[in-house]
């Protein structure tokens, strides 16, 4: 199996994303204090394409959560999402879901994106 977290970390710390957001992290904090932020979670990683009973690759999936404030001078979830999608696609990920999520706080906007990719040894 490949180290998917290392792969996501490299991709999501691309300057096109970090220029728009204050925080990129790989775990959900108890409370989000700095906006905008990107949180990525390793959703699933499975073996694929076996030869001689050994996996020849991985199918990996990642969830990307984008949080921002609905205030002036904050990048929107759409602006950040477009950059995330651009960087992920350049790294051969397919976006299989991209949606705005309702949040309790009126000033907070939340977008969830799901990406998948197959990686072969």
Give the positions of each predicted feature.
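Short C-terminal domain-edge/linker segments immediately following a structured domain
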Residues: 53-55, 68-74, 94-99
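Acidic-leaning, charged glycine-interspersed low-complexity segments
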Residues: 82-121
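Short, low-complexity, polar/charged sequence segments that are solvent-exposed and flexible
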Residues: 42-46, 57-61, 83-87, 115-116
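Oligomerization/assembly interface segments of phage tail-like spikes and tubes
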Residues: 56-70, 109-119
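Glycine-rich loops and low-complexity Gly/Arg-rich segments
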Residues: 48, 62-67, 88-92, 121
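An anionic, turn-rich surface loop/hairpin at beta-sheet edges
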Residues: 77
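Small/polar-rich, solvent-exposed N-terminal microdomains that initiate assembly or binding
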Residues: 1-54, 72, 80
